[in-house]
Every structure is written in structure tokens, then in C-alpha cells.
């Protein structure tokens, strides 16, 4: 229903919008043509009127000549009306004066607010109602509210609950209206026993207990009576329905002879009575009675079982009633004993409460006396403290008054002195204007000269310090370059450090020098070359040794090193002889850094033998690099002073 209403409302809205669109398509070209035909230019081509006949409106069959219609300029895109024809009739032009007929204005566009509001209201109401039904099926509290206050809420919820029930249990009402099946009499059944005929086994006598549990002539008297009564009821119902359906005009057929029902051999037993225990308030007794009543109900449903188990059921009823009476008596005895215990506990509690109240009263009296004494002591203490506070406040107020008076006197004296100084200053200014008018200018010039002198003295001092640092660095270099042997240069380095105490670069350079270098000195270039030649001889001897060489390997390497030829310095190679030749050439050129790099490429025994020489070369390079860094910093400070 809700979906159909929404679709119908959408269809109405679409048809209304189509009608408005068609009306606008009919009206807008006319107005635009009036504007276009009024604007003509010399470059425009004259529009040729269409030769096709003018379409005739559905209401009017009169033919309008094409000369009476205003020419319409062709647009790039033709507008084709795809909507159904509008119900609004176009205006009929007058026949007498077709040129002066006014064109009607376009119809105002309908907003459709009411339809849109109605559509939104219906959609919102439907969604809210559906959501309410869904919540009512999920929540019990909302179910009560929805079915009580919302119109048709209870019917909607019941409808969906029934649908849910039928979906879960599709076979619930399928066999509800059918009649019970008619059972045939036991005498009409023809059965063949399973053990009939011949068999290879010797026949055995069956026990009586097994025959009693099986169906047969010995226990089918009740069933036969039940089947006979059921057949009689069904036959009677069919005859009554046939008599009602038979027509009145036709004579009724003679009824068939009715078969008299056979009387059962055993009389129908009386129904078993349920167990009722008076005063059974205990849950255990009630549960026991309910269980036995269920058993009695099940037994009573079967007539043969009711007769068979009547005596045990009566005995069980008696036992259950006896048990109920015993439980009631035990409960009464327990209640009586509990009541006595409660009375004793109440008496004991009353005595204890009286004793406790007496103790509380005594403790309260003692505490009241103690509190009274403490209160008096505290009151006296507060009185003394209050009096001391009053005395202190009075003394402070008196001191403040005296101090305020002294301050006022001092302020008056200061004010008098200020007035006196102002008078003196005015007199001095007058005198200065008269005789000493140039003193302020002279004082300013003197201050400026003092400032310039101070600045130049700072510049001279920094320049002198920079020159001293440069001299100290040159002294260190001269000691290193002019020495013929290893010579310590501690004094020169200490002088540099004292002169550049505030320079972090010079301090870092001095700290990078190994203490052994400036305490014992560093070897000269000639000493390094001489020592390298000695080390090179040993390296050549061990150049052919493997890492795990023995005595024989050492002897063989020593012999072969004597017959090895010395290579040229420009040869390239990674062998020991090539590295030694290149290193010696670099040492003769004075390039210690490259020589150390070449020797560092050696491996094995050659590198182990040249380890001490490499350490000396590194120490020399570190000292030279530090001295160069200090010289650069000294030059930089000189440039700063000059700028």
C-alpha cells in the first residue's frame, strides 16, 4: 500500500512537470523570436519563411496563412517536444488584424511545494511507522507503548507476528481439521508370524514374560472396544451429514442395518485421582506432587495401565501424603525451635543492650567532664592569646603612626632640598648662560676623544696579541723545520696556548697533538727516509712469507729477497716491491701523506713490520696539520683586526 501510494504521487509529480515543460517550450520560443526579429543588422541574411503549413491546434480547424506567423530563426539544436500535449490551449490570433495581435505572456511556473511536502510527509510517516513496527517486534517496552498509543499498531504487530509464526512452523495447522483415522478391528487384521514355516533350528518355548508384552488376543479386549466405539461414532456422523444433504423431493433410501457394538469383556476402570497434599508449602513437596501427578496423568491416559497400576498409585499417594505430613510436622517443630532460639537471642540482646547503654552513659559522663575541663583550659588559652594579640596590634599601630610621621617629615625635608637644588640650578644655568656656555660642548668632545682612545687601545691590544700569536706559531714551525733531530717543542706550544687562551680553534688543534710528539719531538724528513729504507729491507725479506710461515719459509724468503730486482718508481701494481718503490719516491718528493697511504695498503707481515714507521709518520702529519691550522687561525684574526 505504501509503495503504491509513493509511486502514484511520483507519477503525478512527473506528469505535472511534463505539462509545465511543454507549456514553457511553446511559450519561450515566441518571446525569444520577438527579441531576435527586433535586432537586425546589415550583415544578417534575410530569413526565408517556412513553406510547410502551420500546425493546426486540436480545438480550431481554421487554416492560418503562413504570412501571419512571425518568422522564426533557425536554432543550432532543434527542440523536439517529447512530452504529451499540454492541456493549456494556445491563444487564437485574430483574423482581421493578424499583424497587431499581442502575444500572451508565459504562464507562471508552478512551484509544487504542497505536493512535495505531502510526498515527504507520506514517506516520513511510512518509514517511521515501519520502524515502529520493527522496534515493537524487538523490544517489549516499545511493544506496549506502540500497541497502546499508535493507531492500528496492535493489528500491525499481530499480523507480522503471525507471519513470523507461520514462517517458523509451516505445518502447525495442516492436520487440525482432519478426523482421526478409523482403526480396523483386531479380528480383521491378517498377520503372518515371523517364525512360521520350516527352520533348521529346534523350536524353543517362549517365556511368558515376553508374551505378555506383545499384542495379541490376551490383551486386545480394550482396544477392540475402543475401535468399535470409534467406528460407530464415525458411521453415525456420516449418516447425519448424508441426511442433511439429501434433497426433500426424493425419497430417502432405506437405512442399512446397523451393526450392534460388542460389549467389552472387561469393564472400563475408573479414572485415577491426582495426589493432593494439604498444607504443602515446601517447594520440594510441590515438585514431588507435580511429578507424581504427571505420572498418574500418563497412566490414566492408558486404560489398561490405569487398571494395572491402580494399587501402586494408591500406595504412592498414601506415602506422599505421609511424607507431606511428616515434612509439615518437621517444619512446625523447626519453626517452634527457631522461635525459641529467637526469643532467647532477643532476651540476651536486651540484656546486652542495657549493659551497653549503662557503659555508654558512664563513658559519656566521663567524656563530658573531660571535655568541660578541656573547654575551660582552651577558653583561658584563647583569652590570653586574644589579649596578647590586642597588645601586639596596639604596639604595631603606635609604631606605624610614629613611622608615618617620620616619613612625612623626611618627605618635607626632601621637598625643601629639591626646591633648594632647583633654585641653585636655575642660578647656575643663568651663570652658565652668561660666562660658561662652552663647558658642555667641551665636555662632550672630551668624552668622544676618550671613547676613541679606548677603542683604538683595544684595537692595538688585539693587534699586538694577534702578532704575538703569529710569532709563536712561526717559532713552533721553525723548531719543527730547522731541527736536525727529534727535538721537543713544549715551550713554544705553551706560549701559543697562553696567547690563544680564548680561541677554541687553537685550543682544539693543540689538544689533537699527541703528548709524546711535543715532549720528545718528531723525526725529521731525513730520519723518516733513512728509517724507511731500513724498514723496506726487512719488508722485502718478509714479502714472500705467508701468514703461518715457519723457519724454512723465513730462510727461503731471505734468500729470494737478495736476488729480487728493484722496480721502477712509475710502475703500477699491488705487490710489496711496487708499493715500496712508490713510497720511497713520495718520501723523496716530501709527500708524507701519500707515502703513508701507500704503506697502509700493505698486508700480512709487511704491514706488521712497517707498523712503527707508519705511527711515526702519522704523528708527524698530525703535528704539521695542527701547526697549519694554528697559522690559518692567526691569519684570520689578523684579517679581522684589519677590517
Swiss-Prot record:
Domain of life the protein comes from: Eukaryota
Membrane topology qualifier: Single-pass membrane protein
Annotated disulfide bonds: none
Transit peptide among keywords: yes
Feature: compositional bias, Low complexity: 220-232
Biased composition (Pro residues): 87-108
Biased composition (Polar residues): 59-82, 188-197
Mitochondrial matrix compartment spans: 43-116
TM spans (from-to): 117-137
Pfam families in the cross-refs: Mitofilin
Subunit structure: Component of the mitochondrial contact site and cristae organizing system (MICOS) complex.
PANTHER family noted in UniProt: MICOS COMPLEX SUBUNIT MIC60 (PTHR15415:SF7), MITOFILIN (PTHR15415)
Protein name per the record: MICOS complex subunit mic60
Taxonomic lineage of the native organism: Eukaryota, Fungi, Dikarya, Ascomycota, Pezizomycotina
Amino acid at each position: 500500500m505504501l509503495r503504491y501510494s509513493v509511486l502514484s504521487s511520483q507519477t503525478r509529480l512527473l506528469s505535472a512537470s511534463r505539462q509545465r515543460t511543454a507549456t514553457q517550450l511553446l511559450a519561450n520560443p515566441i518571446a525569444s523570436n520577438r527579441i531576435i526579429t527586433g535586432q537586425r543588422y546589415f550583415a544578417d541574411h534575410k530569413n526565408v519563411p517556412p513553406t510547410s503549413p502551420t500546425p493546426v491546434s486540436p480545438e480550431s480547424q481554421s487554416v492560418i496563412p503562413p504570412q501571419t506567423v512571425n518568422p522564426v530563426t533557425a536554432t543550432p539544436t532543434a527542440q523536439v517536444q517529447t512530452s504529451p500535449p499540454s492541456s493549456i490551449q494556445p491563444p487564437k490570433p485574430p483574423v482581421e488584424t493578424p499583424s497587431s495581435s499581442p502575444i500572451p505572456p508565459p504562464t507562471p511556473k508552478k512551484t509544487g511545494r504542497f505536493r512535495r511536502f505531502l510526498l515527504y510527509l507520506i514517506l516520513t510517516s511510512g518509514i517511521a511507522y515501519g520502524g515502529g513496527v520493527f522496534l515493537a517486534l524487538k523490544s517489549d517496552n516499545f511493544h506496549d507503548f506502540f500497541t497502546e498509543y499508535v493507531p492500528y499498531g496492535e493489528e500491525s504487530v499481530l499480523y507480522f507476528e503471525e507471519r513470523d509464526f507461520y514462517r517458523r512452523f509451516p505445518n502447525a495447522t495442516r492436520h487440525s481439521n482432519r478426523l482421526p483415522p478409523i482403526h480396523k478391528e483386531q479380528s480383521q487384521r491378517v498377520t503372518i508370524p515371523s517364525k512360521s514355516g520350516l527352520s533348521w533350528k529346534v523350536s524353543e518355548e517362549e517365556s511368558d514374560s515376553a508374551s505378555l508384552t506383545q499384542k495379541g488376543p490376551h490383551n486386545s479386549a480394550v482396544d477392540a472396544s475402543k475401535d468399535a466405539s470409534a467406528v460407530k461414532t464415525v458411521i453415525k456422523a456420516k449418516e447425519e451429514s448424508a441426511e442433511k444433504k439429501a434433497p426433500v423431493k426424493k425419497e430417502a433410501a432405506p437405512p442399512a442395518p446397523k451393526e450392534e457394538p460388542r460389549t467389552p469383556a472387561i469393564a472400563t476402570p475408573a479414572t485415577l485421582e491426582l495426589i493432593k497434599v494439604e498444607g504443602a508449602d515446601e517447594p520440594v513437596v510441590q515438585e514431588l506432587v507435580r511429578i507424581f501427578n504427571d505420572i498418574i496423568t500418563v497412566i490414566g491416559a492408558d486404560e489398561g495401565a490405569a487398571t494395572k497400576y491402580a494399587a501402586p498409585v494408591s500406595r504412592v499417594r498414601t506415602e506422599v501424603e505421609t511424607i507431606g505430613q511428616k515434612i509439615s510436622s518437621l517444619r512446625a517443630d523447626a519453626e517452634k525451635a527457631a522461635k525459641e532460639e529467637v526469643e532467647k537471642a532477643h532476651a540476651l540482646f536486651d540484656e546486652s543492650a542495657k549493659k551497653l547503654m549503662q557503659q555508654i552513659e558512664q563513658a559519656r559522663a566521663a567524656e563530658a567532664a573531660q571535655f568541660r575541663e578541656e573547654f575551660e583550659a582552651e577558653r583561658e588559652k584563647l583569652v590570653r592569646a586574644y589579649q596578647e594579640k590586642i597588645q601586639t596590634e596596639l604596639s604595631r599601630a603606635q609604631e606605624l603612626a610614629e613611622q608615618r610621621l617620620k616619613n612625612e617629615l623626611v618627605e618635607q625635608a626632601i621637598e625643601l632640598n629639591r626646591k633648594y637644588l632647583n633654585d641653585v640650578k636655575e642660578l647656575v644655568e643663568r651663570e652658565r648662560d652668561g660666562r660658561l656656555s662652552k663647558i658642555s660642548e667641551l665636555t662632550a668632545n672630551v668624552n668622544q676623544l676618550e671613547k676613541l682612545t679606548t677603542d683604538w687601545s683595544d684595537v692595538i691590544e688585539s693587534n699586538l696579541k694577534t702578532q704575538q700569536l703569529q710569532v709563536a706559531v712561526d717559532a713552533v714551525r721553525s723548531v719543527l723545520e730547522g731541527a736536525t733531530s727529534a727535538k721537543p717543542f713544549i715551550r713554544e706550544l705553551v706560549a701559543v696556548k697562553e696567547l690563544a687562551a680564548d680561541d677554541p680553534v687553537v685550543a682544539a688543534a693543540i689538544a689533537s697533538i699527541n703528548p709524546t710528539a711535543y715532549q720528545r719531538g718528531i723525526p725529521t724528513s731525513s730520519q723518516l727516509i733513512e728509517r724507511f729504507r731500513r724498514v723496506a729491507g726487512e719488508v722485502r725479506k718478509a714479502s714472500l712469507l705467508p701468514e703461518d710461515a715457519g723457519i724454512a719459509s723465513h730462510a727461503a724468503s731471505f734468500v729470494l729477497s737478495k736476488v729480487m730486482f728493484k722496480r721502477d718508481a712509475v710502475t703500477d701494481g699491488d705487490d710489496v716491491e711496487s708499493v715500496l718503490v712508490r713510497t720511497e719516491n713520495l718520501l723523496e718528493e716530501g709527500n708524507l701523506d701519500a707515502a703513508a697511504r701507500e704503506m697502509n695498503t700493505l698486508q700480512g707481515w709487511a704491514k706488521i713490520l712497517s707498523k712503527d714507521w707508519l705511527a711515526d709518520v702519522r704523528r708527524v702529519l698530525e703535528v704539521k696539520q695542527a701547526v697549519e691550522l694554528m697559522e690559518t687561525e692567526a691569519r684570520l684574526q689578523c684579517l679581522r683586526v684589519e677590517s
